[in-house]
Curated annotation (Swiss-Prot):
Pfam families assigned to the protein according to its UniProt record, in alphabetical order: PriCT_1 (PF08708)
Source lineage: Bacteria, Bacillati, Bacillota, Bacilli, Lactobacillales
DNA-binding region(s), chain positions: 120-141
Keyword DNA-binding: yes
GO biological process terms, semicolon-separated: DNA replication
GO molecular-function term, one example from the UniProt record: DNA binding
Cited function: Essential for replication.
Disulfides per UniProt: none
Alphabetized UniProt keyword annotations: DNA replication, DNA-binding, Plasmid
Biological source species: Streptococcus agalactiae
Protein name: Protein RepR
Keyword Isomerase (UniProt): no
Length: 496
């Protein structure tokens, strides 16, 4: 493993290439580069906990100490210094000193035998996510996965570190996503200290798996939108609009209006922002998400409020003194600022509620999606990375799952059409079915070395009568996601 290249991939040119003084590899004719940022490194977990470390400002200094450090800060700070005369205790690794955000990382902590996972489990979950980790490191009690950005996000103090706040939301959503199925430490610092890549701990590395901040942000917004809001034993009807206040038509009408002012007293800018914030609160969004969106809303206004006023309004909405935005008051706001002709039908969508469905054992009919869960679990249990498919019979599947014959046939066709499984049926007395999940096949390919992939893909193509391009294109989708719009200005300014 080329560890210097791994380090360079993570750091995104955030440090100098060569040491400013006493460089052993910089030529005499090459001038020292202009000062950039700094990171912190530690030679053991004990030293890290005690704060005993070193400040590094060049990649050369990292490479000189290859395999002697155990921890580092993969995100770059504006400066680093020491808190004592002996230069033993580091100082400066605080969020308000961040210079650039290079990567998100997740700490998978295994505390019991039941929680035992492998790097393959992380990759499998990542395939579902649609964003692959750039790097997976083995630690004493588990793993750490790095999701390195395509380009770094530069932090600016001018906007009260909005980029850090936005990145925190993304980082938390990534951790919560993986935490649904794997043992994730949800409490560790988002941009703090992590395991450093070494020759003895890198389990997986692919520099092609890097995505833009905008892509992560778009995904994160959807994740936040999907976070549920429960009410006793009731749930919102699937597909019903208006299930949350942020889904109501009035919310978008107010959110995209820009000509508010304070001259109308009770129905001015402050009231509109407070009402929008209440909608975020009642819909189950975090205060960080609401604050970020209210900053964006405020920036669009012809007469924006001061940022400290925005923070004050959001915190008031999240004080738990209110349940949500008042319907009557919403109507007044929309008529005052959007259009006086608006009616309740234009602004609100009636909600529908129903009780939780019975347990499967108590029902006469089982939904196809539930049979899908059973079948996918069965495939996963009977196959692994090294043999990602299983040979069996439809009869055996029916007996194991208790699924009716016609339902199984329909399920197989649906899953194949949705490109979730591959299967091949061999007729006759000695026939059967060869079955594999697309996810398992992709994972087995990802784990192979590049020179082995070609022959392996050919073998899979022959086994399942597949077009080779489908597997290759699917891999490419993971590695080469479509380019998105340029990043927002607030992420591109440097305070250095």
């Amino acid at each position: 493993m080329n560890i210097p290249f791994v380090v360079e991939t993570v750091l995104h040119d955030g440090l100098l290439k060569y040491k400013f003084k006493n460089s052993k590899i910089r030529s005499i004719t090459t001038k020292p580069g202009k000062s950039k940022g700094a990171i912190f490194a530690y030679r053991s977990k004990k030293s890290m906990i005690g704060g005993r470390g070193v400040v590094l400002t060049s990649e050369e200094a990292i490479h000189e100490n290859q395999d002697t450090f155990t921890h580092w800060t993969p995100n770059v700070y504006r400066y680093g210094t020491y808190a004592d005369e002996n230069r033993s205790y580091t100082k400066g690794h605080s969020e308000n000193n961040l210079r650039q955000i290079n990567t998100f990382f997740i700490d998978f902590d295994i505390h019991t035998e039941k929680e035992t996972i492998s790097a393959s489990d992380i990759l499998t979950t990542a395939i579902d996510l649609g964003f692959m980790p750039t790097l997976i490191i083995k630690s004493d009690k588990g793993y750490q996965a790095y999701f390195v950005l395509e380009t770094p996000v530069y932090v600016t103090s001018k906007s009260e570190f909005k980029s850090v706040k936005a990145a925190k939301i993304i980082s938390q959503n990534i951790r919560e996503y993986f935490g649904k199925s794997l043992p994730v430490d949800l409490t560790c610092n988002h941009f703090g200290i992590a395991r450093i890549p070494r020759t003895d701990n890198v389990e997986f590395f692919d520099p092609n798996y890097r995505y833009s901040f905008k892509e992560w942000q778009d995904w994160s917004f959807k994740q936040t939108d999907n976070k549920g809001f429960t009410r006793s034993s009731l749930t919102v009807l699937s597909g019903t609009e208006g299930k949350k206040q942020v889904d109501e038509p009035w919310f978008n009408l107010l959110l995209h209006e820009t000509k508010f002012s304070g001259e109308k007293g009770l129905v001015g800018r402050n009231s509109v922002m407070f009402t929008l914030s209440l909608a975020y609160f009642s819909s189950g969004y975090s205060i960080e998400t609401c604050e970020y969106n209210m900053f964006e809303f405020n920036n669009r206004l012809d007469q924006p409020l001061e940022e400290k006023e925005v923070i004050k309004i959001v915190r008031s909405a999240y004080s738990e003194n209110y349940q949500g935005a008042n319907r009557e008051y919403i109507t007044i706001l929309c008529k005052a600022w959007v259009s006086s002709d608006l009616t309740s039908k234009d602004l609100f969508v009636r909600q529908g509620w129903f009780k939780f469905k019975k347990k499967r054992s108590e029902r006469q009919r089982v939904h196809l999606s539930e049979w899908k869960e059973d079948l996918m679990a069965y495939i996963s249990e009977k196959s692994d990375v090294y043999k990602p498919y299983l040979a069996t019979t439809k009869k055996e599947i029916r007996e194991v799952l208790g699924i009716p014959e016609r339902t199984l046939d329909k399920l197989l066709k649906v899953l194949k059409a949705n490109q979730e499984i591959f299967f091949k049926i061999k007729p006759g007395r000695n026939g059967g079915i060869q079955l594999a999940s697309v996810k398992s096949l992709l994972l087995s390919i990802i784990k192979l070395k590049k020179e082995e992939r070609e022959s392996y893909i050919k073998a899979l193509t022959a086994s399942f009568n597949l077009e080779r391009t489908f597997i290759q294109e699917t891999l490419n989708k993971l590695a080469e996601r479509p380019k998105t719009d340029p990043q927002l200005d607030l992420f591109s300014y440097d305070t250095g």
